[in-house]
Amino acid sequence: MFMSAKSPLLLLVDGHSLAFRAYYAFGLSKKGPLRTTAGIPTSVCFGFLNSLMQVMESQKPAAIAIAFDRREPTFRHEADGAYKSNRQETPEDFAEDLSYLQQLLEALNLQTITYAGYEADDILGTLACQGSDAGYQVKILSGDRDLFQLVSPEKNISVLYLTRNPFSSNTGYDELDWQGVVDKMGVTPAQIVDFKALCGDKSDCIPGINGIGEKTAIKLLAEYETLEKVYENLAQIKGALKTRLDNGKDDAMHSQMLARIVVDVPLPVTWEDLQLTGFSTDRLVPLLEKLELRTFIDKIQAFHRNFSDNQSPVPMGNEADNGEPKKTVKAKKSKEKVNPDDSQQLSLFDGVPVVNQEDGLITIQLPKQIQPQIITTIAQLEALVEELKKHTDADFPVAWDTETDSLDPLVANLVGIGCAWGQEPNQVAYIPLKHHQGEQLSLGIIKDLLGEILGNAIYPKVLQNAKFDRRVLAHHGIELGGVVLDTMLASYVLQPEETHNLTDLCRRYNLGLVALSYKDLGLKKDQTIADLPLETAGQYCGLDCYATYLLASKLQKELDQYPELKEILKEIEQPLEKILAAMEDRGIRIDCDYLQTLSQQLAENLLTIETAAYEAAGESFNLSSPKQLGTILFDKLGLDRKKSRKTKTGYSTDHATLEKLQGDHPIIDAILEHRTLAKLKSTYVDALPELVNGQTQRIHTDFNQAVTSTGRLSSSNPNLQNIPIRSDFSRQIRRAFLPQKDWLLVSADYSQIELRILAHLSQEPVLLQAYGDRQDVHGVTAKLLFGKEDITPAERNLGKTINFGVIYGMGAQRFARETGISAVEGREFIDRYHRTYAQVFDYLETMKLEAIAKGYVTTIVGRRRYFNFVTEALRQLRGKTVTELDLVDVKMNYNDAQLLRSAANAPIQGSSADIIKIAMVKLAKLLESYQTRMLLQVHDELIFEMPPEEWEELAPLIQNTMEQALTLSVPLVVEMHRGSNWMEAK
C-alpha cells in the first residue's frame, strides 16, 4: 500500500482572537459579562473552552497548538510606529480572565506558544507550513482575515473562520478553503497580502495606497494577479489610478511587508509537544470549581475524549500522567520536558512518529512490540512460506500489504510485500524487492515461491483497500486470491458516514496503535519508499500489516452482529472490488483530436456568450469574478437583492442565487450557460487528454467504493459521474469515449430505476399499476394532474419533472422555477400530486420518522445509512417507535431539515446503488465466456466494449441479467444501445 492513512489533523488556534470574541460576546450581551460569586471574570474562560470543545468534537485533531500575542512590540511595530496604534487598551477584567484561561489550558496539557518580536499570526503561519511539510492536514481557528493568506489546497491548509458570535451557533465557524476565501474576499489566498498592500487595512493601521479602495484592489489583482505585476504593467494603466499607484509605490511595498505573515519563526517546539497526551483531573477540576464552571465539570469525560487523543477516559483520581502540565513556550527559554509514565499510556503511537533523516538515512522510532522479519534470502522466504501454509482458518486470515513507488498501479514498481499472521512481535514479515540499497530477492523468486500463497484461495487473506494491492500485484504477474476480508470495505458497510483509512480505523477500534501515513516517513519530494532502508520500510509496512491483522478479528466480530450487512460485504462489495480493479486496468479509449476540435468550438461559444453578457450589462466585466458580477447584477441592473445573500465583498452570485434570478433579466441565462460551458471545457474537454496513459492510450478512472454514504460508487481522475447530459456540448463530450478499434461501445441503462424502487417501497397503487401495465409513468402522472387523457409533450415533461423531483424533496418554488410556471401554479401542482400519490408521501414521511427513531434507514437489501441530528428535540426522540413520534411542535435547524430530506431519499438511492452493484457481480460471471469487457459504471448505466459478432447473442443476456438483479413489485427495465462512441450508444 503506497499510502495507508489519511493525514492526521493539526489544529492551530488563534488564542487572542478566540479570547476577545468570547469576552465581547458575553460582555455586550443583555446579561453582561460572566463572573463568579466572588467576582472573578469568566467570560473568556467559558466562551473559549466551550468553543474549543465544539471544534475538538467536530474536527478530532491529532495535535493542537494555541498561539497568543505578547505585550512587547513586534518587528512590525518597530518598522512602523503607527502599526495597530488604534487598538484600545486591554480591559483589566479581560487580562484577569485571560490569566485564568492560561491556567486552564495548562491543566488540560495543551501547548500555548508565544515568541518575542512576533505576533500570534506568525507563530500560526510557521506551524501551519511546518505541519503541512510534516504530513499534517492543518486547520486554523481564528476570526482574523489576515490568516486567509495561509490557505492552500496544495499544503492542505484551511481556516475555521469564527462567526460574528461563535458561541451562538452549532459550530461557531465556517471552514474556508481556497474557494471560500475567494468568495469572501474577492481575491485568492495568495493575493491577500497584495490586496492589503494596495488598499490597506484600517483595523491594523496598514496604510496601503491613498485613494485605492477594496473594489479597485480586487479589480487590479483580477487583471494583473500580483502587486509586482501591477507595477510591471503600470504603463498600461491610465488616468488618476496610474498616478495613485505611482505615488504610492513605497507605501504599497511597506504595507506588503506589514501584511505578510512570517512562516519561519524559530520556535522551540517539536511535534511531540503538540500531541494530545491527556491531563490531570486533580489539577483541572479544582480550577473549574473555583471559576464556577460546573457545566464543564459535568462534561469531564468529554474533556478526556477530546483532549486525550481519543484515549479511553481516565477515572478521576487515577491519572494517566504525572499531573505536570505542558509549559507555555516562550522565546529564548528552556522548556521543561514532560515524560509521562510509559506504563500508564494507553496508546503505542500518539500522532505522528519521530522521523530522523541524517546523511540520507531515514529511520522511524517505532515501538519494540513490532519486530518485522526482513526476508532477504531464499532460505528465509522458504521458511516464511512454510509458516504461512499453516494459516488456512478464514477466521484468522493473514494480513498483506504492498509497498510501491507510485500511487498509479499501471506504472508503480513493487518495492516490497509485507504480511502479518499473528499477534506476536515477530509474526510480521517484510520482503523487499526494489529498494535502492540492501540485499533483496528478485521478482522471479517471489513469484515462484510466494505466488502459490498469494494466488491460492485456500490461504485466507485480509487487506486494507485490496483493489490497489490486487492491481499492483497483477501488473507484476502475481494473482491475488482468497481475500476473505477487506477492512476498508468492512468499515464502509458498517459505518458508511465515517472515514475508512487505516489510521482512523486503528483509533476507532482502540487497537492501541496508529498506522502511519506515507508523509510520516519524512521523504523528500524526489524520494519514494524505495529510498528507505530495508529495516525502516519493514517497520512501516509491518505496522500496516499488523494493524490490519488486529482489525480483522474486531470487524468480523462486529459483522457477525449484523448478518444483513455481512451479506452485503461478502456477496456485493468484496466481489465488486475485483471487478472494479479489472475495469480500472482496462480503461477506455479517448479521441483526443476530437476533443481538441470541441475545445475550440467551446472557446468560440464562450466568447459569444461573454459579448452578449457585456451588451446586456452595458459594459465589459469579468464573468468569473463574484464581486464584479454582483456589482453588475444588483447595483447596475438593480436585480432583486432579496434573492441573494450578503457576503463580505457584496452579494452572492452562486448557482442557487442565479437560479432564483432566472427570468428576471436575459443576462442570467448567459451567465449560467457561460459557467456550464467553462466548466465543461476546463474539467473535461481540456483535461481528459492530459489523463490519457501513454502506454495504453486510454484513461483509467478510479472507482471509489468507500466514499459515498448512499452506497453509490464515485469516480475520480477523472470524475465521470459528473459529466452533465442536458446541454448539446455535454452530450458531445461523450462522443470522445471510444471502444477498442473496430468494436462496439454498448450502453445498458436502467430506465427510471429510482421511480420503480419508490413504487416498490411505497406500494403506491397508481405507480404499481402503471409500471405493471408497462405504461408511460410520466404520461400517467400528467394525465392525472391535468385531469385529461390527451396531453401535450410539454405537459408530459411537467409530469416527468415532478415525478423525479419528489424523490429529492423538491418543493413548489423549485418546481415552478424548473418548469417556468408561477409559484401559485407550482403549489397547486404539488398539492394535487400529494393527493394523487398519497401513499408515496406516507412512505417518505415514515422514512423520516424511522431516521429519528432508529438513527438510520435501510435499503431493500439492508444497507444502512445513519443520521445524527443536532436538534435536541429530535435527539430525545431516539429509541421511540415511529407511531409514537409527533413532529408538529419540533423546531429544527436547517441542517437537520436537510438530513430528514436525505433520510427520505436514502433507501431509494441506496437501493438503486445496490441493484447495479448486484448486476455488475452477476455480469462479471457472465462475461467470463466472452471477449466483451465492462468499462464504466456511471449512475444507472453500464458501459461495455464488445466485438460486433457478440452483440446478437450477448446483448439480450446482459439485459436479462440486469433486469433480474433484484426482484421488485414492478419490473426493472434496461435499455440497450450500441454505437461507435458513447454518444451514439445513448
Curated annotation (Swiss-Prot):
CDD domains: DNA_pol_A_pol_I_C, DNA_polA_I_Ecoli_like_exo, H3TH_53EXO, PIN_53EXO. GO terms for molecular function: 3'-5' exonuclease activity; 5'-3' exonuclease activity; DNA binding; DNA-directed DNA polymerase activity. Residues 593-986 are annotated as: Polymerase. Residues 1-303 form the 5'-3' exonuclease domain. Pfam families: 5_3_exonuc, 5_3_exonuc_N, DNA_pol_A, DNA_pol_A_exo1. SUPFAM superfamilies: 5' to 3' exonuclease, C-terminal subdomain (SSF47807), DNA/RNA polymerases (SSF56672), PIN domain-like (SSF88723), Ribonuclease H-like (SSF53098). GO terms for biological process: DNA-templated DNA replication; double-strand break repair. It is an enzyme of class 2 (transferase). Disulfide bonds: none annotated. It comes from the Bacteria. It catalyses: DNA(n) + a 2'-deoxyribonucleoside 5'-triphosphate = DNA(n+1) + diphosphate. Gene3D superfamilies: 3.30.70.370, 5' to 3' exonuclease, C-terminal subdomain (1.10.150.20), 5'-nuclease (3.40.50.1010), Ribonuclease H-like superfamily/Ribonuclease H (3.30.420.10), Taq DNA Polymerase, Chain T, domain 4 (1.20.1060.10). InterPro entries: 3'-5'_exonuclease_dom (IPR002562), 5-3_exonucl_a-hlix_arch_N (IPR020046), 5-3_exonuclease (IPR002421), 5-3_exonuclease_C_sf (IPR036279), DNA-dir_DNA_pol_A_palm_dom (IPR001098), DNA/RNA_pol_sf (IPR043502), DNA_polI_H3TH (IPR020045), DNA_polymerase_1 (IPR018320). SMART domains: 35EXOc (SM00474), 53EXOc (SM00475), HhH2 (SM00279), POLAc (SM00482). Residues 308-327 are annotated as: Disordered. Its EC number is 2.7.7.7. Residues 304-592 form the 3'-5' exonuclease domain. Keywords: DNA damage, DNA repair, DNA replication, DNA-binding, DNA-directed DNA polymerase, Exonuclease, Hydrolase, Nuclease, Nucleotidyltransferase, Transferase. Single-chain monomer with multiple functions. In addition to polymerase activity, this DNA polymerase exhibits 3'-5' and 5'-3' exonuclease activity. Belongs to the DNA polymerase type-A family. This is DNA polymerase I. The lineage of its organism: Bacteria, Bacillati, Cyanobacteriota, Cyanophyceae, Synechococcales.
